[in-house]
């Protein structure tokens, strides 16, 4: 749908920008307003649909109200009331056409919120949406990254308009590919067909995590999001150790060296002592019947059962079997394990469930001492972790809000030290994470700051170049540079 507004002379310096989509339109409008005001421009903000009324929003009785605000402050958001006075959230709607035309003449920059999504981060627009003025200079399309990983019924406005091409149903868990299809089919395709001479760009919003920021960059540059795997962005697994005896303490030390987030639980106060277990991230003294609320929700959690008694071992194992996990290991001799499994079968646990328990725990290396047993357990955990996931992401990298260039190994051959999915973030102050060290990492660090857009580059570590980059055995790495 189009509204007939002022026909601008394109040679004028003034600009009209429409912001459409969902999941951050108002934030985008404010960001643009702040930028242009910093350049000394007079900025006028309004809507062709509706937007939230703010404390400084002008509800004009006449055009002089808008003109005065613009001239005195260099900024004016204006619109007509669109909700009852007693509404919890007050909104404004479009201005009368003559008010709008005069305000555009007075302002250097006009910013228009041109779409509605009822607070949802994603939207499938109707045929009459977004509502774009005829004299538009730029159209910015927003989509919220907070929709990723959530069911469509909870995060997509006008979901009933989804067709077969979008492959989105009510229970569909949204992936980057869904969002990219939605952008292309719902916004970019139709708008570029209708506004052939208008600059139309994607500006994703609500990108908080590193994964969301990477996907946002791919959507913004309109690059294929299938190049990115979400498995690469899973934090190193959490480890829950039931029991805090000799083996548990040695395993804790190794787990911290391996960068596991570690939770220790014991039912004895003298053992569940935070001072004695200072390397642990969390320590709990709890009866093993009462631990459900302190166990992690993430499905790549490792559980190790090393309590002081058979009954507690079984209780802990049964608790874990009722929740998602990546690894469950239980200490004990073959005889003890067989007896425990027999009781569990009698209690109704299936052979399939019981077969997921690694017991006796650890790789068979003839371990005898607590230190050796801990090493055998850690080795088995590493084997499971590296078989099931490609992520080597540290907690620091997972949680970072730093800007920079993310460098990801997307292909490898030969004996290069790090696998596919390994990554480091090159910031203005240094690096977070690693792609294997050596001269290869040094070279990538040096080249990263010059990467202003998503770029792939292959490093051949064979023969002469191998020696140059410090790789003795050679191989190839493909690095994906992503500014975030």
PLM region spans:
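Segments forming oxygen-rich coordination pockets for charged ligands
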Residues: 220, 226-267, 274-276, 284, ...
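Adenosine-phosphate binding glycine-rich loop
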Residues: 331-397
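N-terminal phosphate/diphosphate-binding loop that engages ATP/GTP or pyrophosphate donors
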Residues: 26, 33-87
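Hydrophobic Val/Ile/Leu positions in short beta-strands of Rossmann-like dinucleotide-binding domains
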Residues: 19, 240-241, 305
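Conserved catalytic-core segment of NTP-binding enzymes
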Residues: 88-99, 104-109, 115-219
């Amino acid at each position: 749908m189009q509204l007939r507004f002022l026909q601008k002379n394109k040679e004028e310096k003034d600009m009209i920008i429409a912001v459409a989509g969902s999941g951050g339109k108002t934030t985008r409008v404010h960001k643009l307003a702040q930028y242009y005001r910093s350049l000394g421009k007079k900025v006028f903000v309004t809507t062709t649909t509706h937007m939230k009324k703010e404390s400084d929003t002008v509800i004009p009785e006449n055009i002089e109200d808008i003109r005065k605000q613009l001239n005195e402050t260099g900024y004016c958001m204006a619109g007509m009331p669109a909700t009852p006075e007693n509404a919890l959230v007050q909104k404004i709607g479009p201005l009368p056409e003559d008010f709008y035309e005069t305000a555009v003449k007075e302002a250097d920059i006009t910013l228009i919120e041109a779409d509605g999504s009822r607070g949802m981060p994603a939207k499938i627009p109707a045929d009459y949406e977004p509502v774009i003025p005829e004299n538009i200079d730029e159209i910015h399309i927003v989509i919220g990254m907070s929709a990723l990983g959530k069911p469509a019924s909870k995060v997509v406005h006008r979901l009933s308009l989804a067709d077969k091409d979008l492959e989105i149903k009510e229970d569909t868990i949204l992936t980057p590919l869904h969002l990219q299809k939605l952008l292309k089919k719902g916004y970019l395709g139709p708008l570029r067909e209708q506004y052939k001479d208008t600059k139309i760009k994607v500006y994703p919003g609500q990108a908080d995590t590193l994964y969301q920021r990477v996907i946002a960059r791919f959507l913004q540059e309109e690059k294929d999001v299938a190049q990115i795997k979400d498995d690469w962005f899973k934090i190193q697994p959490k480890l829950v150790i039931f029991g805090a005896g000799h083996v548990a303490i040695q395993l804790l030390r190794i787990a911290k060296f391996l960068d596991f987030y570690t939770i220790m639980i014991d039912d004895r106060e003298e053992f569940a002592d935070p001072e004695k277990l200072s390397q642990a991230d969390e320590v709990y003294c709890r009866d093993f019947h009462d631990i459900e609320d302190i166990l992690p929700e993430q499905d790549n959690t490792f559980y190790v059962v090393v309590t002081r008694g058979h009954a507690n071992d079984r209780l802990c194992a049964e608790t874990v079997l009722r929740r998602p996990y990546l690894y469950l290991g239980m200490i004990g001799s073959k005889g003890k394990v067989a007896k425990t499994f027999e009781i569990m079968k009698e209690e109704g646990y299936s052979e399939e469930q019981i077969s997921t328990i690694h017991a006796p725990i650890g790789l068979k290396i003839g371990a005898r001492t607590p230190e050796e047993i801990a090493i055998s357990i850690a080795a088995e955990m590493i084997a499971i972790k590296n078989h099931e996931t490609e992520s080597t992401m540290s907690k620091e990298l997972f949680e970072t809000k730093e800007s920079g260039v993310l460098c990801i190994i997307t292909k490898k051959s030969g004996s290069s030290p790090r696998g596919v999915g390994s990554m480091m973030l090159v910031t203005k102050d240094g690096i977070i994470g690693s792609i294997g060290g050596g001269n290869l990492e040094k070279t990538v660090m040096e080249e990263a700051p010059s990467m202003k857009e998503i770029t792939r580059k292959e490093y051949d570590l064979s023969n002469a170049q191998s020696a140059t980059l410090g790789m003795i055995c050679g191989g190839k790495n493909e690095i994906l540079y992503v500014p975030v």
